[in-house]
Amino acid sequence: MAHRPKRTFRQRAADSSDSDGAEESPAEPGAPRELPVPGSAEEEPPSGGGRAQVAGLPHRVRGPRGRGRVWASSRRATKAAPRADEGSESRTLDVSTDEEDKIHHSSESKDDQGLSSDSSSSLGEKELSSTVKIPDAAFIQAARRKRELARAQDDYISLDVQHTSSISGMKRESEDDPESEPDDHEKRIPFTLRPQTLRQRMAEESISRNEETSEESQEDEKQDTWEQQQMRKAVKIIEERDIDLSCGNGSSKVKKFDTSISFPPVNLEIIKKQLNTRLTLLQETHRSHLREYEKYVQDVKSSKSTIQNLESSSNQALNCKFYKSMKIYVENLIDCLNEKIINIQEIESSMHALLLKQAMTFMKRRQDELKHESTYLQQLSRKDETSTSGNFSVDEKTQWILEEIESRRTKRRQARVLSGNCNHQEGTSSDDELPSAEMIDFQKSQGDILQKQKKVFEEVQDDFCNIQNILLKFQQWREKFPDSYYEAFISLCIPKLLNPLIRVQLIDWNPLKLESTGLKEMPWFKSVEEFMDSSVEDSKKESSSDKKVLSAIINKTIIPRLTDFVEFLWDPLSTSQTTSLITHCRVILEEHSTCENEVSKSRQDLLKSIVSRMKKAVEDDVFIPLYPKSAVENKTSPHSKFQERQFWSGLKLFRNILLWNGLLTDDTLQELGLGKLLNRYLIIALLNATPGPDVVKKCNQVAACLPEKWFENSAMRTSIPQLENFIQFLLQSAHKLSRSEFRDEVEEIILILVKIKALNQAESFIGEHHLDHLKSLIKED
């Protein structure tokens, strides 16, 4: 290990005797040495042995610490040198008490060497020979003999329990003196650690105290340094204050007011002039500051505008990137839709053909059954008129059709009995049952078409087939660049882009079924509504806003499909189909109609199709035959049953037509329902019937179908012109029934007249037949 450079120390002249004393060695090996008391070095300069100096050094708190360290470190360094040379020999010597003191003294000085950082190697070399004397061979031999003689005595107990420092030292000792090693039987096996001597314990305690004292001394040194610094600062501040006070006293003496001096009289004009001059200067300064402030404000504004220009110029690259990505996206979307539109049209055609085939099957079957049954009854009537004894033969086809008709009617009666519907009238049922084999084929074909529907966009990413994702793209465009968005008329393009995607979702949609999904519950409808609700356009762009997107989609996609259902698939005689169709049409035509000033061609086409289809149903499907009274008086005769069924079937169509109240105009409904159906077919059948409770019941059903909206005007005394024939029939029936005992039926007829606002006719009838008790019915109305 490298030695520190040599250091020089100043020593007092009085310490020379101490250094001389340090060179002295004990006169005799066995002479006892007195252990120094810890803390004695506090009062004395370093003198005597280095051991006393080392023990007393840490206990000094005040006094000349520097010189104490010099002596202690020099002594330690001096005594450390011979111990390093002698090595293990000095550590393994087993001598008498005096030699043990010397060896112990040497070990303590070696331990104290680590406590001082100021030792000098040069000084230790000078004092090496004077402080420690190495015992010679004669001295060692004499000590060994003395120890052996002491061991030979029986009552001798050795107090030397000091352990050898190391195994290597013992080996070297045995090698140096093999004769001194005891025999095997004289060796003692150490089972525990040998106890320390009193001197060793005292030395260890002194070392620990020295370490603690050294730490305390370092803290005391820091505390002393800090106190001195604070005192120097305080003295310096006090001196400065004294200097200031002295200067202040001197200046006060100089500036002392002398009352003997006289001043010229005060002139107010001069003071005023000075104040005005000062005010002018301040105003000019203020104006200059204002000019500078305005200049700074202009600079700030120009800086802000420059920043905005720079930011906008830096965003041009991002804007270009966005427009480019949007252009690529729209092109890819159009290419995808153009590729899929052919497949979509094929699937739509397949589904439409399947439903059309089913509808035509029902219609053709109804017409064929009506034709065969009517022919059979006519033949039966001719037979009854010509002869009563001849045999009547029916061809096999007619017989099979009649049996099939009766079989289906029987099943429907049983179903109504099970459901508890006992008020059903024959002829009002929808004869739309299919044989099981045909139903299985229909369901299989429909399932195959729906599987093809699912595979249309199976391999396409959601960004190009999901309506919500597509609208989100355009919504981002609208939020980032609204000007370019509205300039591109995107609200007019979106319905065309979404048309194929919506048509795919409408393949399984059948508005003629009551269980069909409503438009508001469809995914595309909700997505479009969310897109419209998120619109942030201002009032200036309201005319071209995205709020018309849904109406445009309905006009371009939904209404044309609905028109196809009305023209080719809708059966006006079916109440369930009519009710479901009206529900969807109300949503389309009322809640999402276009602007009042704008005429929708698709909407007009739909309404025309509805009216045209109902006219066709009135002309083709309504057939009420007229038979002789002798044939229909018997309610169980086939003629009477057939006539009843056909009347109720016509009344069912009458009711279905008037369900369009609110969607079709009143003139259209009155012309179609009252003019062509009621007056042309139903009234004739009623006139051919015998007056009685059945006729009154039928009249009640006719009046119940009429919309209340037509009779809301309380000032009406006469009904609408199209009901004139019906009113005359009611009065005629009332005249006939009043002559008999059907007074309750007469009262019901009066109520019907009051309901349809034929009040004048009702009052005339009551006055003519002196039915004063029925006048209250008119007054209550």
Swiss-Prot record:
Which residues lie in Acidic residues bias regions? 17-26, 213-222
As annotated in Swiss-Prot or TrEMBL, what is the tissue specificity of this protein? Answer: Widely expressed in tissues and cell lines.
Q: Which GO terms describe its cellular component?
A: cytosol; nucleolus; nucleoplasm; nucleus; U2-type post-mRNA release spliceosomal complex
Composition-biased stretches (Low complexity): 114-123
Q: Name the GO terms of the biological process aspect.
A: mRNA splicing, via spliceosome; spliceosomal complex assembly
Q: What is its main location?
A: nucleus
Q: Where in the cell is it found?
A: Nucleus, Nucleoplasm; Nucleus, Nucleolus
Q: Which UniProt keywords are present, listed alphabetically?
A: Coiled coil, mRNA processing, mRNA splicing, Nucleus, Phosphoprotein
* Phosphothreonine modification, residue list: T97, T213
Regions annotated as coiled coil: 267-312
List residues modified as Phosphoserine: S16, S17, S19, S40, S96, S129, S174, S180, S214, S217
In this chain, composition skew of type Basic and acidic residues spans 82-92, 101-113, 201-212
State the function annotated in the UniProt record. Involved in pre-mRNA splicing through regulating spliceosome C complex formation. May play a role during late-stage splicing events and turnover of excised introns.
Please describe the quaternary structure of this protein. Answer: Found in the Intron Large (IL) complex, a post-mRNA release spliceosomal complex containing the excised intron, U2, U5 and U6 snRNPs, and splicing factors. Interacts with TFIP11 and DHX15.
Question: In its UniProt entry, what is this protein called?
Answer: Intron Large complex component GCFC2
Organism, scientific name: Homo sapiens (Human)
Upper lineage:
Eukaryota, Metazoa, Chordata, Craniata, Vertebrata
